[in-house]
Amino acid sequence: MNNKNIGKILKTFVKKYSITRLILFGSRADGTNREDSDVDLIVEFSVPVSLITLSRIKIEMEEALGLVVDIVHGPITDDDMIEVNKEVVLYSVYY
């Protein structure tokens, strides 16, 4: 599945979960993915989100995509212990 199709499917979650940004990173963002590679996402929200809700979102996204999804609650700062080499913004209210 290509990034455009992933973005189209994931945009269906925006309103339901008050998502303000969906950012793809990892192998799918830099083009080194295999067909079965996981989907690494930074997800930002307009409201506070519990770990239970994050888990529910992850499960629903995996079911919708048919791929493993890893979610990082954004925004990410320089102090966070995660390295993001390339980002592909799939959705943003800030455009």
Language-model-detected regions and their locations in the chain:
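Amphipathic, hydrophobic secondary-structure cores in small proteins
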Residues: 39-44
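Catalytic core of pol beta-like nucleotidyltransferases
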Residues: 1-23, 29-35, 46-95
